[in-house]
Amino acid sequence: MKTRILIRYGELSTKGRNKKMFTQKLASNIKKSLVDFPQVKVIPDYDFMYLDLHEAPEEAVIEKVKPIFGIQSISPVYIVEKDMEVAKKVVLDLLSQEDLEGKTFKIMTRRSDHTFEMDTNQINLFLGDAVLEAFPDIKVQLKQPDITVRIDVRREHLMVSLKTIQGAGGLPVGTSGRAMLMLSGGIDSPVAGYLAMKRGMEIQCVHFASPPYTSPQALEKTKLLAAKIARFGGSIQFLTVPFSRIQEEIKKSVPEAYLMTIMRRFMLRITDQLRENARALAIANGESVGQVASQTLDSMVAINDVTNTPIIRPVATMDKLDIIKVAEEIDTFELSIQPFEDCCTVFAPPSPKTKPKLEKARQYEARLDVEGLIKEAVEGTVIEEITANYTTPVETASQEIDDLF
């Protein structure tokens, strides 16, 4: 008996003529997530996708593909010949491994081969009677049973499955275009990146580093956050922007109350230039309306003035507790609250303007060599690929020492 993993599509089922493009992208993302299991073969089909395991561990493969967006649900399926006696034996064998006391069940048959000798109702009755005879403790329940035995009659074979595992939903990463995520080391921006990816956006992470004011640990922490969200799409390009000189120049020339506004305007300009270089379509960030001084509507107007590029704000209307809940679900929260200050925190004024005037922001900014500073920062940007398996140099060194002993 051969085992496969069946993947059911989420919103892809509604995509009409574009469905092939969506399924191909999903297949590509799944292959990237299974880099540790090169023997697994991904087989896209119109209604489903299959993974041929070729001796790869079933549970480990399922754990790798569960976070991939575009998947509605996952089921281990057993491929058997088109013989109902064989199918009955497989169903009874599988159920014998379950705790059935006090449980309910139903048989659910899907028949794409309409030439098969039995119709859907006949298959349900045949297998249902066999289960009741073999396991007297179990009862039939057609609505919300504890166990659903799924039978799929295909042209080549029958497929039997007992378990359905919830997938991540959403759209395959990359099907909605590319966006640049402004990734700090905080709680909100990784959640924003996750939610943007869930709507099919491929993201590249832009991080502003200000050594020596910010530590190497702050940078590594942010790379680890990128690795956490890379699980949902395969791999992510991480762009480290040198920002110290810009912050020093701003602090010399701009009134304290406007430091944050001007700094954010520079960040947005630089991200927009990097977006253009990467041929991305939008910028995403973790701004939540009213949460801090730079995230009031007045501040957003003053900061957004520097670009016409669409700004995606996935957490804009979420309460902090709701953002934290998502951060905990995607395993970024504990990392985000590690006490390493980012460039915004280090240079934050004690009383930033919550209602900055656009005219004043432009006036103060005119004191600076805006184009020259942006050009220098963009040219000094370091790009690297971050995967879900990324580890910090400290972790790698520790592992190498452990391996010696």
Regions found by a protein language model. Name each.
Residues 186:
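Conserved G/P- and acidic residue-centered "switch" motifs that form tight phosphate/ATP-binding loops
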Residues 141, 239-241, 312:
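General small-molecule cofactor/ligand-binding pocket signal
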Residues 331-339:
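A short alpha-helix-loop-beta-strand transition element characteristic
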Residues 129-131, 170-176, 247-248, 252-330, ...:
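Active-site adenylate/phosphate-handling loop in enzymes that bind or generate adenylated species
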Residues 1-180, 190-236, 353-361, 367-368, ...:
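RNA-binding accessory domains that recognize and position tRNA/RNA substrates
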Residues 8-10, 163, 206-208, 241-244, ...:
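Generic beta-strand/beta-sheet core signal
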Residues 226-252, 342:
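A conserved beta-strand->alpha-helix junction
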Residues 289-291, 339-347:
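Small/polar glycine-rich anion-binding or flexible loop at a beta-alpha turn
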